[in-house]
């Protein structure tokens, strides 16, 4: 346990936030003990890889740093494999390990920063795959009571970049382990346009997809170790077919992708780019020159500067297109 700890090294925006009390958690039993020791009514903050969060200047009370490790093969019938993974494991390292073991399904999600425990919260996705496609169950502990729970795929309520864990009903849970079901004989998933354009028919192998995904991400997204960022700062808006028909009357070239039955997903990057935001810099935060959906730090060390630029971008998109943008990273602490 460390009191008055700086969190700069624990978030990829490199924000100069601090925690009143920081505790590294390495087991679910320790987690439950820490929760039991909290003052009545106290709710801890939780940090994982810090790659999809915006930390406000000071986090009062207790902040738990999730460091539960471990990979355990629960079952293996030579086709399907079920693996239980600690929430504190590196996401990318886990993906690469699965690939080398011949456990397929996650290669398209390679090089996404963060931890295994953060993957279900956001329902991370890339290049035509979402992590929900490979999750069997999520194990968690109640933030206030220490109660254990195992949430099924249905319980998790996965949607585009969303899950029950981002809402009141699920935010009470702290994820400790995730059970994945992977497939030794899974077909290659290379239908996403960016990925398909990179690969020839002769290269439609799991090895080629993994290499291509890593290469594309390195080309398109800045390394957070060098340039503070959280990847995509906004979700791609999901709107009804009726709304896209109206939008296309004035903006026929807006990129559209399938989402669900009567909804489509539109490119937030395109909306932002068309309004001239690329390269714009304010108070130490800049819209990337290479990707309008990525905000980069160039001196800003507080959440306020990031949130202010994001709010201005969202307001301009709302005014121009009557489309609402949602932040992809979660804000932790009280923004002020």
Show which residues each predicted segment covers:
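Anion-binding (especially nucleotide phosphate/pyrophosphate-binding) glycine-rich loop
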Residues: 1-145
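Phosphate/pyrophosphate- and phosphate-bearing ligand-binding catalytic cores of soluble enzymes
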Residues: 2-3, 8-15, 53, 148-296, ...
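A common structural junction motif
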Residues: 40-43, 314-321
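Short amphipathic alpha-helices in soluble, non-transmembrane regions
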Residues: 34-40, 193-195, 309-313
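His/Asp/Glu-rich mid-to-C-terminal helical/loop segments that flank catalytic regions of hydrolases
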Residues: 301-317
């Amino acid at each position: 346990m460390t009191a008055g700890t700086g969190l700069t090294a624990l978030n990829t925006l490199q924000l100069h936030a601090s925690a009143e009390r920081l505790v590294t958690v390495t087991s679910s039993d320790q987690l439950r003990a820490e929760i039991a020791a909290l003052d009545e009514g106290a709710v801890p903050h939780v940090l994982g890889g810090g790659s999809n969060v915006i930390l406000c200047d000071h986090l009062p009370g207790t902040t738990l740093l999730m460091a539960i490790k471990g990979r355990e093969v629960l079952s293996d019938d030579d086709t399907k494999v079920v693996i239980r993974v600690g929430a504190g494991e590196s996401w990318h390292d886990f993906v690469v390990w699965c690939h080398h073991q011949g456990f397929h399904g996650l290669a398209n999600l390679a090089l996404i920063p963060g931890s295994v425990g953060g993957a279900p919260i956001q329902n991370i996705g890339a290049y035509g795959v979402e992590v929900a496609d490979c999750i069997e169950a999520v194990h968690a502990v109640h933030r206030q009571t220490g109660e254990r729970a195992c949430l099924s795929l249905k319980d998790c309520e996965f949607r585009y970049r969303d899950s029950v864990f981002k809402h009141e009903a699920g935010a009470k849970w702290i994820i400790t382990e995730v059970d994945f079901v992977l497939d030794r004989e899974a077909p290659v998933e290379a239908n996403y346009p960016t990925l398909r354009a990179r690969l020839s028919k002769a290269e439609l192998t799991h090895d080629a997809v993994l290499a291509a995904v890593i290469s594309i991400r390195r080309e398109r997204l800045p390394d957070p170790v060098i340039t503070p960022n959280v990847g995509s700062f906004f979700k791609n808006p999901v709107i009804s077919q009726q709304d896209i028909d109206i939008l296309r009357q004035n903006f026929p070239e807006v990129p559209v992708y399938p989402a669900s039955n009567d909804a489509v997903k539109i490119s937030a990057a395109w909306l932002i780019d068309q309004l001239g935001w690329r390269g714009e810099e304010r108070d130490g935060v800049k819209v990337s020159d290479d990707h309008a959906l990525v905000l980069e730090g160039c001196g800003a060390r507080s959440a306020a500067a990031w949130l202010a630029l994001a709010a201005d971008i969202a307001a301009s998109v709302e005014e121009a297109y009557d489309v609402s943008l949602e932040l992809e990273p979660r804000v932790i602490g009280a923004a002020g």
